[in-house]
Swiss-Prot record:
Name of the featured protein: 7,8-didemethyl-8-hydroxy-5-deazariboflavin synthase
Cofactor remark from the record: Binds 1 [4Fe-4S] cluster. The cluster is coordinated with 3 cysteines and an exchangeable S-adenosyl-L-methionine.
Subunit description: Consists of two subunits, CofG and CofH.
Gene: cofG
Presence of the UniProt keyword Isomerase in the record: no
Positions of the Radical SAM core domain: 18-249
Length: 336
């Protein structure tokens, strides 16, 4: 499909363009069988009412005319052996179908999936995501000791499975949870090696641990300089086709965003009304962010939740949805 050529979308590494995804988050359930000590999201299994389709539709109607493109379906994890797992999977599919029917582009992040689950979601999402977090097994004795699905080899297998299936994929590192600099490098190298095999990873999120009021154990925040250093290392390790993302609402120092961009970050992720994972850190006003970046010589532009060079991997039905949004973004760009 020629709409997705490099002539339409310049590589962010070769321009002054900083991208973001105009997004809205739907949470099918906050219940999760993992107990990560730093989590500000989860509720105990059976203690949360699942999101109904009618409620989801009502919420999406409120943002339909606000320029929102991506519907991020971000879910707590129902145990793979739970009798509710099949119903949970079906709710994920139904929410993605609803988003498509209402003119949005869905992206789902719901933890590790078996092959059949991933294929089912592949058919109704323009991309999928899962944070690799850190590959070191040491964290299974500390922050992840009560989080079975944070097994690093299980999560790395998810990246491989997505690659085998040809799914555009987002992954990332959680920084400042007890890992070493060497651990970070090895995690980045593993992502790069997986991408070399399949060419499916579109972006890597570098997310600094940011303490919140709901977490079980208070861990210190990541030092600002460590994030900047990690961005620079990631830009050296990862192929240029993989965008490096930093979440601007988690950058607490005034100069930190500028320094991360200078080190090679080119994407700000989903700008949403409410950060479900980090509820104590809300996003800045988009117009103010755009103006601040412009003063530094950057141009903030919206993007799709699937990167242009990976659109051809999508089912034809999803490519049609993507083409409509790309035409819309291009029209907005020409008129601005």
């Amino acid at each position: 499909m020629k709409h997705f050529s490099d002539q339409t979308w310049r590589s962010p590494q070769q321009s002054a363009v900083i991208t973001y995804s105009p997004a809205y988050t739907l949470v099918p359930t906050y219940e999760c069988f993992n107990r990560c000590t730093y989590c500000n999201f989860r509720r105990d299994p059976g203690m949360d009412e699942w999101l109904s389709l009618s409620t989801a539709q009502q919420r999406l109607l409120t943002v339909r005319d606000r320029g929102v493109c991506e519907v991020l379906i971000l879910s707590g994890e129902v145990h793979p052996q739970s009798p509710r797992r099949a119903a949970w999977r079906q709710r994920l599919i139904e929410l993605a179908e609803l988003a498509l029917d209402m003119g949005f582009l869905p992206h789902t992040n719901a933890g590790p999936l078996n092959r059949a689950e991933m294929i089912a979601l592949q058919n109704v999402n323009v991309s999928l995501g899962l944070m690799l977090e850190q590959l070191t097994p040491q964290l299974q004795r500390t922050v992840h000791r009560a989080a079975p699905s944070k097994d690093p080899q299980l999560r790395l297998q998810q990246l491989e499975q997505a690659g085998e299936l040809g799914i555009p994929f987002t992954t990332g590192l959680l920084l400042g949870i007890g890992e070493t600099s060497r651990d970070r490098l090895e995690t980045l190298e593993a992502i790069a090696a997986c991408h070399d095999r399949w060419g499916h990873i579109q972006e890597v999120i570098l997310q600094p641990h940011s303490p919140g009021r709901q977490q079980a154990i208070q861990h210190p925040p990541l030092a600002p300089d460590e994030l900047i250093d990690c961005v620079a290392i990631a830009r050296q390790v990862l192929p240029t086709s993989i965008a490096i993302q930093v979440p601007p609402n988690l950058l607490t120092q005034p100069q930190q965003l500028a320094d991360c961009l200078g080190a090679g970050a080119r994407d700000l992720g989903g700008i949403v009304p409410y950060d479900e994972v980090n509820p104590d850190y809300q996003h800045h006003d988009l117009d103010e962010l755009r103006e601040a970046l412009a003063q530094q010589g950057w141009q903030l532009q919206p993007r799709l939740p699937v990167y242009p060079h990976l659109v051809d991997r999508l089912p034809q039905r999803l490519q049609t949805h993507v083409a409509a949004w790309l035409n819309r973004f291009n029209s907005q760009s020409r008129s601005s």
